Amino acid sequence: WKDTINNISSKPKDRYEKSVSFEDLKTECEIYNRRILKKNSKFLIFLLHKTKIMNFFQTINIKLYDHNKSYNYSIFKGLVELENSDPDVSMHSQSLAFIFKNEFGFDTLTVNGCFESDKKNFSKFVKTFGIGTLNASGLSFSLGLLAEPQIIFSFFKRLKNVAKNLI
């Protein structure tokens, strides 16, 4: 195992083959938002978004380094191009498309680490896209979920553990 570990840096790196266009990302985003709002309580999502309670479902600034541009994402406004500004998270357009196309996309991204973020903004990232993980596990964000404190506790415990391990 020592040889394998010592030779990691000499191995070829995986590279993204091509960028996903803004138009395609916007389309995937619209499909994603419709799916999320259909499976979950639009009222609760809107309430948390507007009241900013614990910063759930807030607009997030995503820099796509292959586009060399930043975009704001919101569950209600979709994906909007903007002038480059301080991003909450940076990634390749294929990673963002993967989140939009797959309920488990966000979870996969946290495992493969194909994004950059600091601890504070990672928390915001989770609170914006983590709902897909909830849906992938067969649950929905609704008043009924509030009666399941062990699930809520598990979510926050997992968020804390992942954030603690960020560099």
Predicted regions span which residues?
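Feature captures hydrophobic
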Residues: W1-I167
